[in-house]
């Protein structure tokens, strides 16, 4: 896959700014990245937009006559609307006509569609959404999972999240020896609720996971950890809070910049620094979160995503494809399962 152009199915009808901003981001990706884009949605609306702009050669339109609204119950909507844009996009991956799906639409519907149409990877009990956060160390990020796929989790789910996050950190983020932390209320192994205590024991005992201990909330962006695992309830709160902090910081900086001629001159001098700051803390720069654990590359973007965020989401999908994240997770699970089977057979024969 790394040697050919990735084919990305984009849910053109999903999101607050669909379809125009979604299409704009997809067009940019088709021009700047080594990808072919399949725009899935109302063909008349998509063609109308493209007629006002030049139609790039690496874009194909796939008609979908239905849309799942944000206020619909996801599972029933997915089953009722088989021709919804997110379902059609997932079917393209299932049929090997696309390598990944990107959607800024109903996140619950995207997860339900992925599970029903693509299924889970062998050895994975629950999917997880992984989000990349900036840290105080320039050029270094941390991936946090789960940030919303599961409100309730079990220790073995978090153990699987840690494994998938480790693989992503190593092969996509380029961290040779990732450090995995468990989000908790204290550094000590005796801290936390029942889920945290039991998960700690599993992570500590798993030699395939480079677990270094508990991570407190203040540690998430410290750069001391490369992977943070938590349940989806806590992770989603953390994600939304981090997004809000970034927006507040940018707004405060805008308000505090001096006014007048001298202020304009100072702002001009600071412009490169301010641009880099925005790139580091703006969630749109990361594009979305990878849905780990399903048998296909799925990127779930923020509902408020505009063209830059969609571009980055497509780039995120491309990175996951080129670095064979799914294949590496599957290979590990198969190896682990075989080792467990061999161990069981050895014990049985000795008895």
From Swiss-Prot:
Q: What is its EC number?
A: 2.3.1.274
Q: Which GO terms describe its molecular function?
A: phosphate:acyl-[acyl carrier protein] acyltransferase activity
Q: Quote a single Gene Ontology cellular component term.
A: cytoplasm
**Entries under Gene3D superfamilies matching the protein:** Isopropylmalate Dehydrogenase (3.40.718.10)
| Pathway in which the depicted protein is active | Lipid metabolism; phospholipid metabolism
Q: What does the entry give for GO biological process?
A: fatty acid biosynthetic process; phospholipid biosynthetic process
Domain of life per record: Bacteria
Has keyword Lipid biosynthesis?
A: yes
Identify the enzyme class. transferase
Stated family: Belongs to the PlsX family.
- Specify the protein name: Phosphate acyltransferase
Organism of this sequence: Gloeothece citriformis (strain PCC 7424) (Cyanothece sp. (strain PCC 7424))
Q: What is the lineage of its organism?
A: Bacteria, Bacillati, Cyanobacteriota, Cyanophyceae, Oscillatoriophycideae
Q: Corresponding gene? A: plsX
């Amino acid at each position: 896959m790394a040697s050919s152009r990735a084919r990305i199915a984009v849910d053109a009808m999903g999101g607050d700014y669909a379809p125009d901003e979604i299409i704009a981001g997809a067009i940019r990706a088709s021009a700047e990245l080594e990808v072919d884009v399949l725009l899935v949605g109302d063909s008349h609306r998509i063609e109308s937009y493209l007629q006002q702009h030049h139609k790039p050669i690496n874009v194909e339109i796939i008609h979908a006559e239905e849309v799942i609204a944000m206020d619909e119950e996801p599972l029933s909507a997915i089953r009722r609307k088989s021709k919804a844009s997110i379902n059609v996009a997932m079917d393209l991956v299932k049929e090997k006509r696309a390598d990944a799906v990107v959607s800024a639409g109903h996140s619950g519907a995207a997860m339900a569609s992925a599970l029903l149409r693509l299924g889970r990877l062998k050895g994975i009990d629950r999917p997880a959404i992984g989000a990349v956060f900036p840290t105080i160390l320039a050029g270094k990020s941390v991936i946090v999972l789960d940030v919303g796929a599961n409100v309730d989790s079990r220790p073995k789910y978090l153990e699987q999240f840690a494994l998938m996050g480790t693989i992503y950190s190593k092969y996509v983020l380029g961290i040779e020896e990732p450090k995995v932390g468990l989000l908790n209320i204290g550094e000590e192994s005796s801290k936390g609720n029942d889920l945290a205590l039991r998960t700690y024991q599993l992570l500590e005992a798993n030699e395939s996971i480079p677990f270094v201990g508990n991570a407190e909330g203040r540690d998430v962006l410290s750069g001391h950890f490369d992977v943070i695992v938590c349940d989806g309830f806590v992770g989603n709160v953390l994600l939304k809070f981090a997004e809000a902090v970034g927006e507040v910081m940018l707004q405060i900086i805008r308000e505090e910049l001096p006014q007048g001629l001298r202020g304009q001159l100072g702002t001009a001098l600071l412009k490169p620094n301010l641009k880099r700051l925005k790139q580091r803390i703006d969630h749109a720069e990361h594009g979305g979160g990878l849905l780990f654990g399903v048998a296909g590359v799925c990127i779930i973007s923020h509902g408020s995503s505009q063209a830059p965020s969609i571009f980055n989401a497509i780039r995120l999908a491309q990175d996951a494809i080129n670095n064979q994240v799914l294949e590496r997770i599957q290979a590990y699970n198969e190896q682990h399962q075989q080792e467990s089977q061999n161990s069981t057979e050895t014990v049985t024969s000795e008895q």
